[in-house]
Amino acid sequence: MSKSTAEIRQAFLDFFHSKGHQVVASSSLVPDNDPTLLFTNAGMNQFKDVFLGLDNRFYRRATTSQRCVRAGGKHNDLENVGYTARHHTFFEMLGNFSFGDYFKHDAIRFAWELLTGEHWFNLPKEKLWVTVYATDDEAYNIWASEVGIPAERIIRIGDNKGSAYASDNFWQMGDTGPCGPCSEIFYDHGEHIWGGPPGSPEEDGDRYIEIWNLVFMQFNRQADGTLLPLPKPSVDTGMGLERIAAVLQHVNSNYDIDLFKTLIAAAAEATGASDPDSKSLRVIADHIRSCVFLVSDGVVPSNEGRGYVLRRIIRRAIRHGNMLGASDTFFYKLVAPLIDVMGSAASQLQPQQAMVEQVLRAEEEQFARTLERGLTLLDDELAKLTGDTLDGETAFRLYDTYGFSLDLTADVCRERNLRVDEAGFERAMEAQRKRARESSGFGADYNSLLRVDETTRFFGYEHLEHQGRVTALFRDGQLVGVIRQGEEAVVVLDETPFYGESGGQVGDRGVLKAASGVFEVADTQKYGKAFGHQGKLSYGELKLGAQVTAQVDSARRERIRLNHSATHLLHAALRQVLGDHVGQKGSLVNDHYLRFDFSHNEAMKPEQIRRVEEIVNEQIRCNLPIQTDIMALEDARNKGAMALFGEKYEAQVRVLSMGDFSTELCGGTHASRTGDIGLFRIIAESGTAAGIRRIEAVTGEEALASLHQQSDLVQHIAQLVKGDSQTLVDKVRALQERSRQLEKDLQQLKNQQAAQESASLGRNVRDINGVKVLVRQLDSAEPKMLRTMVDDLKNQLGSAVIILATVAEGKVSLIAGVTKDLTDRVKAGDIVGHLAQQVGGKGGGRPDLAQAGGSDIAALPAALASVDAMLAAKL
């Protein structure tokens, strides 16, 4: 019996653990250490700084099953997903890594043992082929002499892009930096499938499939292209879980493995589809994986960046569900089957299931409102098409008005053997961007563009004043040697007590004092490993290399510390009251208040908000010690410390504990004891996106001021209603009851007035072709009264056409009533349509009653005068 996908994943990790590798958890799909990446797309992403020598880990061997997404950016498989056997938006990359430990010999030996070992994957050795870089004799000899693969199944791959080392078998991190040859392992699916070995003209067939890539990082590429040996060569390998599962489960397509068969069956049930081989079911089964894990990792649908890619994937899945006949929301229903089939890889999903379902359902409901209209427009445009290309302007209109991404429109066109003018789409998009830039009035933010090579040591945990040396000066984004009085700049120091904004905590303010001048610091930001002090030189001048005394605004820092510690108490209290699915999704901590975003799929009830507030204040009164410990990241996680989404952690981390109540990883500044916070008060709770809630709160003196403000408000209201705080509620209720009674009395008077006016209006009826017609503009009537008056006049006249109009709040209101015996001759909707067109408005309704509005008051008399001729033609 073949292994399940979950069992294959576990076997891989178990094998390398037995070989001394540290099992490292998958990192987030949102890269935390590489701003150049849209999404994590390879197993080595989380180890990039280790390979570059910028990060040290307590282990030299590691193994992972890394979640990856390839949709958007350089690596974009979206348009092929569902139409090929192996393209996915989401996949898992199994990998083993050596950081200056073992090299080619052990990497190849481990791979061969896992693939062919009787107790592991036990693949037939004759089914495996390998490639090596053309000049990598070392790897070739290991495969041939030590492993024993026949020479005809070892293929040397050379340069194929016209330049040295530009080869499928030579890996490079970039134009410079670590690089080296790689060796790929292929599986032969058999003669019954078309295709040839790697390097042959038929290599693009499906017979020989790459299952594992072993990258040997042994060189450091210089700017001039020369390769220098690395002092500690390393290994980075990657094996697609879905591909090896297809091999071990004896199927040729990834969509035929157990995991996808389960998801496809669930998608068929949710959409009502009957053909299990439908490409649309494959699309949906693939897309639910990427969408669920992206939402779980903190991405929410939006119109920019990662959120827009997520929105595109969700909407593509919804469109394919629509093609299958889904008549109701279906996509969110696949979250539970996915969690069931993912096994241990879904552990992070279980507490977030409800939140993920809520986000997906909300997005589906939103898109459903425009999907049908957008598809109708697209169908109409394609029906009129004379060539084979849809113009870019139409594609952009679908994007801008109906939320159709370019790839969704291209999908529809491809199904009809048509294409989209992508260049025209981009021109329309750029024109819109240009209009937006011109209307915004904002220039470039030079500070956001700074690239700083310096390193700053932070001393702000222990000191608020410290000596430092100026190592860089930036003015208008450019490096300078000196700044002078009145100039704004960014000052970088070698050592500082100023906290640089991170982890939601704002940067410090204060002053830098030098012998030659004083620099007022308005903010502190991090630029890589440097701290940039942003502000203005208020006196003298400041030169590169100058010694300064850096003084933090201590009162402001103290308020920030209290608010930051309060966020930790709030986080723990929310998990107590709402459940363990609550996770931090963002925060802001400044000297006035704190803002905390968290995962939860509905608005908090008033009693829940109060209970959270009570719990936090209980912990404040306990005056718990706030303790900081430095420990290994894995030890911190084993201790139960919560690691926060989007944060990058070193091998050694700061663990902040507040008694037994809260334990989190945190690099921020904090109070010494919870009692220092004094008082905690929630001032607002709201939603920011589907599945994301936000709490705003204040502490200490701000919390006390908030209570005083509320007390003053209560006293003021009590005075207005001639009561006190004890009787205020009863007084307000009495006023509400009095208001309701007055509204009721007023409505009765209005009804009486309408009846009287209706009676008098009945005397103004005229005859058109034997039919009673009443057309009247009423100067004193409210728009709401017109309906009642028409009903009264119908009863009074028996058989008639009635048209009433009034002007209120600068707008025209019209109503037409036709008794049922006349609706086969003239319809109320036609009458108001005729009138609305003349007064600059629109309207509609039933044949016997219709209403309209308009903005052209001056045109109303002429419009009413035109009714007689219209009715004479119809009656």
UniProtKB/Swiss-Prot annotation:
The biological processes this protein is annotated with in GO are: alanyl-tRNA aminoacylation; negative regulation of DNA-templated transcription
User: Gene Ontology terms, cellular component aspect?
Assistant: cytosol
Please list the residues that bind Zn(2+): H564, H568, C666, H670
| Keywords annotated in UniProt | Aminoacyl-tRNA synthetase, ATP-binding, Cytoplasm, Ligase, Metal-binding, Nucleotide-binding, Protein biosynthesis, RNA-binding, tRNA-binding, Zinc
Where mainly located?
Answer: cytoplasm
The listed locations are: Cytoplasm
Reaction catalysed by this enzyme = tRNA(Ala) + L-alanine + ATP = L-alanyl-tRNA(Ala) + AMP + diphosphate
Checking InterPro entries in the record gives: aa-tRNA-synth_II/BPL/LPL (IPR045864), Ala-tRNA-lgiase_IIc (IPR002318), Ala-tRNA-ligase_IIc_anticod-bd (IPR018162), Ala-tRNA-synth_IIc_core (IPR018165), Ala-tRNA-synth_IIc_N (IPR018164), Ala-tRNA_ligase (IPR050058), Ala_tRNA_ligase_euk/bac (IPR023033), DHHA1_dom (IPR003156)
Q: Pfam families under this entry? A: DHHA1, tRNA-synt_2c, tRNA_SAD
Extract the SUPFAM superfamilies matched here.
Class II aaRS and biotin synthetases, Putative anticodon-binding domain of alanyl-tRNA synthetase (AlaRS), ThrRS/AlaRS common domain, Translation proteins
Identify the cofactor(s).
Zn(2+)
The protein's job, in short, is: Catalyzes the attachment of alanine to tRNA(Ala) in a two-step reaction: alanine is first activated by ATP to form Ala-AMP and then transferred to the acceptor end of tRNA(Ala). Also edits incorrectly charged Ser-tRNA(Ala) and Gly-tRNA(Ala) via its editing domain.
- Tell me the protein family, please: Belongs to the class-II aminoacyl-tRNA synthetase family.
HAMAP family, per the entry: Ala_tRNA_synth_B
Q: What is known of its domains?
A: Consists of three domains; the N-terminal catalytic domain, the editing domain and the C-terminal C-Ala domain. The editing domain removes incorrectly charged amino acids, while the C-Ala domain, along with tRNA(Ala), serves as a bridge to cooperatively bring together the editing and aminoacylation centers thus stimulating deacylation of misacylated tRNAs.
Q: How does it assemble?
A: Homotetramer.
Q: Which PANTHER family match?
A: ALANINE--TRNA LIGASE, CYTOPLASMIC, ALANYL-TRNA SYNTHETASE
Q: What is this protein called?
A: Alanine--tRNA ligase
